[in-house]
């Protein structure tokens, strides 16, 4: 029996930062299937377009009524009557025909908005899973051509100290994460992470005062830390105090594009201070040396966006220097875009993809980006955005694609824990048919 789309309705809802975002209800004979899209704060310039209204009289210009109108008036009429199991056909219709906008990196979604297209793409996935009478993660695995007899549960990369554009402190690097690779299961990994998180809170309170334990957009703490060493020392202390030395490692998201000066090709590690300390302005080569020193001193297993999104040369230098032992992840560099991934492969610029579905704007293209990366023996980390919703789609996606790693914030704030809690449910439902990635989070688990 064909399960056709009978109705599509989009609405404007609020994300975790209080900004508007797009939610879609898609109806078939099996019921209503809902999806909501996230949005980022530190966005890469090569991301597909997130359509905002720019009407300063509503939500300070951040409204998404244009995207809503595009769904209700342009996309919905074309999709009604189509079979919800035709994911690729529907995504291609939206991206290539109804939108059709392109730039040098592929389909840019600048006409209808990636936020409009993605919301429908996700809702279609949920409807397709119901039509096939399988869970969303099993259906996504089928779409990706992955085996679904034994699924992989990811290591959670929990963002517990915030800096960069996500925080009001002086810390230039954006995220410091704890990675419980030594746990025997996802459930235990989450427990390790939560215990380290609470231990860290006590350490911060002791050292910086009670008001230093306020949390940022992703649930991490943002004490008035001045540099990366100070943050890493705090993490090492918290991990040790919680009893998980050797079992919990560290990952960083530098988000270096946020403090890169393209005119003189330097990185300002004091970019949040009006009269910055000139000794903290570094060349790319000096930054390479800084990362090498940090990796020698601390149990760092992954570094994301260590350089600007166009600094291919220094990416390649760092990957050549430490890529065997440390995952070098491209986020702003790659923006989940198969064309950018291909360029990075040619230049040996990094060895892992950060997979953000809203950077590329459709589930079909996100799967393509993942498969291209895995085919070339890269790691893949599925990721949230700093402006999130209660939608848990990425929890199912990470299990389906067998990537072995996910970052979706600290074990704090409901829009973050919603994803972790969904992974707990998935692990429970799979029972013996689940394997936890653990120490092998970088390896091919396909």
From Swiss-Prot:
Annotated motif DKSLVK motif, positions: 277-282
Gene3D superfamilies: Enolase-like C-terminal domain, Enolase-like, N-terminal domain
EC number: 4.2.1.11
Topology of this chain in the membrane: Peripheral membrane protein
Modified residues (Phosphoserine): 42
Keywords recorded for this protein, A-Z: Acetylation, Cell membrane, Cytoplasm, Cytoskeleton, Glycolysis, Isopeptide bond, Lyase, Magnesium, Membrane, Metal-binding, Nucleus, Phosphoprotein, Ubl conjugation, Vacuole
Protein's pathway: Carbohydrate degradation; glycolysis; pyruvate from D-glyceraldehyde 3-phosphate: step 4/5
Modified residues (N6-acetyllysine): 133, 375
Residues that bind Mg(2+) 2: 253, 304, 331
Main subcellular localisation: cytoplasm
Thermal activity profile: Optimum temperature is between 20-50 degrees Celsius.
Family per record: Belongs to the enolase family.
Protein name: Enolase
Gene expressing this chain: ENO
């Amino acid at each position: 029996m064909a399960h056709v789309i009978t109705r599509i309705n989009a609405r404007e809802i609020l994300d975790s930062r209080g900004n508007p975002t797009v939610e879609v209800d898609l109806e078939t004979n099996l019921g209503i299937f809902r999806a909501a899209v996230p949005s980022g704060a530190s966005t890469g310039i090569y991301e597909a377009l997130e359509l905002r209204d720019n009407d300063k009289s509503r939500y300070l210009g951040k409204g998404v009524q244009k995207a809503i109108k595009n769904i209700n008036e342009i996309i919905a009429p074309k999709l009604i009557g189509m079979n919800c199991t035709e994911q690729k056909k529907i995504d291609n219709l939206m991206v290539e025909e109804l939108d059709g906008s392109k730039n040098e990196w592929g389909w840019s979604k600048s006409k209808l908005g990636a936020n409009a297209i993605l919301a429908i793409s996700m809702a279609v996935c949920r409807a397709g899973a119901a039509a096939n009478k399988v869970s969303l993660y099993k259906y996504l695995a089928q779409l990706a051509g992955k085996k679904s007899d034994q699924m992989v549960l990811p290591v959670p990369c929990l963002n517990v100290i915030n800096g960069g554009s996500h925080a009001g402190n002086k810390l230039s690097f954006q995220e410091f994460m704890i990675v419980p690779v030594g746990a025997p299961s996802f459930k235990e990994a989450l427990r390790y992470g939560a215990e380290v998180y609470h231990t860290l809170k006590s350490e911060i309170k002791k050292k910086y005062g009670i008001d230093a334990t306020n949390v940022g957009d992703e649930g991490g703490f943002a004490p008035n830390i001045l540099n990366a060493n100070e943050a890493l020392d705090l993490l090492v202390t918290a991990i040790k105090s919680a009893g998980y030395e050797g079992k919990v490692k560290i990952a960083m998201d530098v988000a270096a594009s946020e403090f890169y000066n393209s005119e003189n090709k330097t990185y300002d590690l004091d970019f949040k201070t009006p009269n910055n300390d000139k000794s903290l302005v570094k060349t790319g080569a000096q930054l390479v040396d800084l990362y090498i020193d940090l990796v020698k001193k601390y149990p760092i297993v992954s570094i994301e966006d260590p350089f600007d999104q166009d600094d291919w040369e220094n990416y390649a230098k760092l990957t050549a220097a430490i890529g065997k032992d440390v995952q070098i992840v491209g986020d702003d560099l790659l923006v989940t875009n198969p064309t950018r991934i291909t360029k990075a492969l040619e230049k040996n610029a990094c060895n892992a993809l950060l997979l953000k579905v809203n950077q590329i704007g459709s589930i079909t293209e996100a799967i393509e980006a993942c498969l291209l990366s895995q085919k070339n023996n890269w790691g893949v980390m599925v990721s949230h955005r700093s402006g999130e919703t209660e939608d848990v789609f990425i929890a199912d996606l990470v299990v389906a694609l067998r990537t072995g790693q996910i970052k979706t914030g600290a074990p704090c704030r409901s829009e973050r824990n919603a994803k972790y809690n969904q992974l707990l449910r998935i692990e429970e439902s799979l029972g013996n048919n689940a394997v936890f990635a653990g120490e092998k989070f970088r390896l091919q688990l396909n």
